[in-house]
């Protein structure tokens, strides 16, 4: 195509002012350097420019590791029309100027940004292809943990803040290998533009602009965030301008975009076609997080009830979404009806108004005190009207149907670790990720369905966003005088009962009939006792003389 003929010439000219004629600082033939354990260090702008010079000269660094060790701030270019950086990697063409040679001048190593921030880059080449921090990345190249702020990237074809083109090669050839772009972040003061230029037969289209990557070809982008201002003529997305892919016989895509989201408010396609909040032209996107077109900046994401098999676990998701407002779904979680108590621990706060609007009809309580006396552990609960992020609660869902996969709207995500509610003799501990008990544990208790409370008598997993009780001061469940033989759960004005162990079972049953009487060893009586002694009624010890 005519556009490509012009591109092959334009690339050589456009990057002239930002190019560095520096020899390699990274000897790829040295097996002891550039490993994952001893990566090549990018310590300053000169090192980054040297990497660009090497790759653009044909050194792909396949299998070599690089790590950014410091924040980098570029000085503004002499004029707005010029550039102060040459992208790492470029796309060249065969002699016919029609066939792209994606592998020839591509980065194929591993670049770890180390969470450091690169700012001030300006690339202004409106007639060039493959523009970004990395122009061209090819399998098995990996770019991860890079942060970008206050940067501007302008090209004509395949423009992205992190990478212009990310290519996996032949469809399916590397489908079981992780490569691509991971856990990168682009700030709101970054602009990405695929500009049109030229006229007539020499006109260049202004295609494929993305806040993270311009064109994702049979490759992967995972866990990335962008708030960039993105524009182009066509194929414009907050994360990717386009995703190209193929699928295996089972229909699974070889390329994917997963757990990424766009938090900006400006994605513009001047030709009014192929523009999306996440991706402009979608060939393959996993149905996961914020992947439908809609209002830019509105986040929707899913937390997994049991994330042990997930490629991205809840901790990573929470870290990616920290301090952002979102609609959050607890996938796989069910709040049971018919007056069943459920434990819950959420990574976001809810005001009293939100609790009323989204959780009604429910009763919400949290642990107030936990005391142990003469073989009886008493857990007292107090009413709550709002939810604190990371604090465990018990909740009684009183709706007519069970509430599966509950969604909470307009909440602000917190990645801070859950906090215990502590009592003298027991704590209430919330979790965001599945917890394995590791075997029998008589110093912990957990609530199950139908208001039944257990201790684990074998290895088991408590799923995410729940809570359990841990016993303090050496207290364990058992029949000895110094052990917990009976348990009282006091729900205030609700009926309260004693919990006692059934024979030959790890199961404890919560009896909650109003005004029932119990002996201290857990035997339920048929009515108020007439014999003198100490008894339990409505969660309190009563002395009858």
What is each model feature region?
Residues 146, 224, 260, 290, ...:
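Short, surface-exposed terminal/edge motifs of secreted or surface/virion proteins that either
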Residues 20-360, 481:
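Surface-exposed repetitive/solenoidal architectures
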Residues 495-545:
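C-terminal outer-membrane/trafficking sorting elements
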Residues 1-22, 513, 542-545:
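Sec-dependent, cleavable N-terminal signal peptides
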């Amino acid at each position: 195509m005519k556009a490509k003929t012009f591109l092959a010439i334009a690339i050589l000219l456009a990057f002239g002012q930002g190019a560095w004629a520096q020899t390699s600082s990274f000897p790829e033939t040295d097996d002891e350097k550039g490993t994952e354990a001893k990566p090549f260090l990018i310590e300053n702008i000169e090192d980054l420019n040297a990497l660009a010079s090497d790759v653009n000269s044909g050194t792909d660094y396949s299998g070599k590791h690089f790590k950014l060790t410091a924040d980098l701030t570029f000085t503004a270019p002499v004029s707005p029309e010029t550039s102060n950086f040459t992208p790492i990697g470029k796309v060249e063409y065969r002699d016919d100027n029609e066939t792209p040679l994606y592998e020839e001048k591509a980065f194929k190593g591993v670049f770890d940004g180390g969470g450091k921030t690169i700012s001030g880059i300006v690339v202004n080449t409106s007639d060039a292809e493959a523009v970004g921090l990395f122009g061209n990345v090819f399998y098995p190249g990996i770019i991860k943990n890079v942060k970008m702020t206050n940067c501007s990237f302008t090209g004509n074809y395949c423009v992205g803040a992190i990478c212009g083109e990310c290519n996996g090669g032949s469809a399916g050839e590397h489908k079981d290998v992780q490569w691509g772009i991971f856990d990168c972040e682009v700030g709101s003061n970054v602009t990405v533009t695929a500009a049109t230029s030229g006229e007539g037969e020499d006109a260049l289209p202004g295609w494929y602009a993305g806040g993270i990557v311009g064109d994702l070809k049979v490759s992967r982008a995972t866990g990335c965030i962008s708030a960039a201002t993105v524009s182009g003529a066509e194929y414009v997305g907050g994360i990717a301008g386009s995703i190209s892919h193929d699928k295996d016989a089972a229909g699974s895509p070889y390329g994917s975009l997963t757990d990424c989201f766009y938090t900006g408010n400006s994605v513009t396609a001047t030709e009014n076609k192929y523009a999306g909040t996440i991706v402009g032209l979608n060939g393959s996107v996993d149905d996961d997080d914020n992947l439908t077109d809609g209002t830019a900046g509105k986040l929707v994401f899913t937390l997994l009830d049991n994330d042990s098999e997930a490629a991205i676990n809840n901790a990573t998701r929470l870290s990616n979404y920290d301090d952002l407002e979102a609609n959050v779904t607890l996938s796989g979680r069910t709040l049971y009806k018919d007056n069943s108590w459920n434990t819950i621990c959420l990574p976001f706060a809810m005001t009293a108004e939100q609790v009323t609007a989204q959780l009604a009809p429910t009763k919400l309580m949290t642990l107030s005190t936990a005391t142990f006396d003469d073989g009886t552990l008493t857990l007292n609960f107090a009413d709550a009207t709002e939810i604190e992020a990371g604090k465990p609660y018990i909740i009684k869902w009183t709706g007519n149907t069970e509430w599966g996969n509950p969604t909470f709207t307009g909440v602000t995500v917190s990645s801070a670790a859950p906090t215990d509610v502590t009592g003298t003799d027991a704590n209430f501990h919330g979790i965001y990720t599945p917890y394995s008990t590791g075997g029998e544990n008589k110093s912990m208790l957990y609530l199950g369905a139908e208001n039944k409370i257990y201790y684990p008598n074998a290895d088991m997993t408590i799923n995410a966003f729940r809570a359990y009780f841990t016993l303090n001061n050496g207290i364990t469940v058992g029949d000895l005088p110094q052990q917990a033989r009976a348990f009282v759960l006091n729900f205030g004005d609700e009926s309260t009962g004693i919990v006692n162990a059934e024979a030959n079972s790890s199961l404890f049953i919560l009896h909650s009939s109003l005004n029932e009487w119990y002996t201290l060893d857990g035997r339920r009586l048929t009515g108020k006792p007439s014999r003198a002694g100490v008894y339990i009624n409505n969660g309190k010890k009563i002395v009858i003389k």
